[in-house]
Amino acid sequence: MQRAVPAAIALLVTASVLITRQSGQPATQLRCRPSAEIWIIRHGEKAANASRTLDLDLSPAGVDRAKNLERLVTSGEWPRFQAVYATSPSAPPFVRREYETVAPLAEALDIQINVSFGAFETEALAADAMRTARSLAAADDCRSPAVLIAWEHCRIPKLRRALGCDTGRCRACWSDLDYDSVDRFRVFADGGVDVLPPTSEGFGGGETTDFAYAMCVDKESEEPGLDCVPPY
């Protein structure tokens, strides 16, 4: 003797079959909105520089931070990024810190770092990263691939705005003492951007004080558009 199928279950199965027939796709796929994430980090530590002369490379602490980023990726704690951007070392101001910060993890992932954009091309970088993220999202069946950007901290508020966030937090200056924070955005293949909760590298160096924003505030007079707001 066959058991009677409860009416609620029968209705659910019928609806699922109907949706599948109408769309040509499994019903579960219809609940997915393809997206990718963009993660933004600052370069690793540099040498103490009271004279404000240009520092090109990472300090030993910065090198250790770069190695920790590789560990985060290879251990599965962080995404296996499918695209990595860094400030071009061959464009003004010719710094290598951003590239050096992501070089170990890029090597571990066997991907080439995109250094097509210099530090003064933040908006062009944002547009390219957005295109890359949307392309990855559309091609990756809702598994939420990720893109990583290593950028100079005073220009990160401008990068946030170029990615579509103009809230108070996105306009806030990045502390001169903070090497650990991570900004995250979700980019949808069909358009639209969500700001995700920030996270951290978990390596220390995320301290701040009311006096830790002088570098970025000073840069406003040197580079129009870096109008970040100190959070005090």
Predicted region positions:
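Classical eukaryotic N-terminal signal peptides for Sec-dependent ER targeting/secretion
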Residues: M1-A10
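Active-site-proximal alpha-helix that buttresses catalytic centers in soluble enzyme cores
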Residues: A27-R143, R155-Y232
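Short beta-strand segments
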Residues: A150-E152
